[in-house]
Design a protein with these regions (language model features):
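Conserved cofactor-binding/catalytic machinery of classical short-chain dehydrogenase/reductase
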Residues: 1, 18, 26-29
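Active-site loop immediately N-terminal to the catalytic Tyr-X3-Lys motif
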Residues: 12-18
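Residue(s) in the substrate-gating loop at a strand-loop-helix junction
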Residues: 7
Length: 145
């Protein structure tokens, strides 16, 4: 069994996350491909998709954005920065990831994706329910862009 840790941003994306989000999209694609390739050998592939988890990731991942030479980015950086407190309140404990890993490892199913936490479940359901243009507009509105 192969259990990969992705993120909800492997299936949807948010402002200022291009590089990180792309890495998670890669994990999703890799996992889907490996599922096809290894299924005949009896291997199970699982993907864990956490949402916002309580950690210092948000502050560390946004350090690049505070570069004064990225002047054109500053309005976006400021808008996203104003949301930081709200993101912190929404964060779920790391245990939701551990619970999703445990479920994936022990449920005996062929399920591929396991959202980790209620916020992840809600965000992915919201994305699945919307077409691309509506999702883009709603995301811009959510972040005040």
């Amino acid at each position: 069994m192969l259990i990969n840790i992705s993120s909800i941003v492997g299936r949807l994306t948010y402002p200022l996350g291009a590089v990180y989000d792309a890495s998670k999209y890669a994990i999703e694609g890799f996992s889907e491909a490996m599922r096809f390739e290894l299924e005949a050998m009896g291997a199970k592939i699982k993907v864990i998709e956490p949402g916002l988890i309580a950690s210092d990731f948000g502050s560390r991942s946004m350090q690049f954005a505070h570069d004064p030479s990225l002047e054109a980015y500053q309005p976006l950086v400021n808008a996203m920065g104003s949301m930081a407190a709200k993101f912190t309140e929404m964060a779920e404990p790391a245990e939701v990831v551990a619970e999703a890993v445990w479920k994936a490892a022990t449920d005996g199913s062929d399920t591929l994706r396991y959202p980790a936490g209620q916020a992840a479940i809600a965000a992915l359901a919201d994305r699945d329910a919307l077409d691309d243009l509506t999702f883009y507009a709603k995301t811009k509105e959510r972040f005040g862009l």
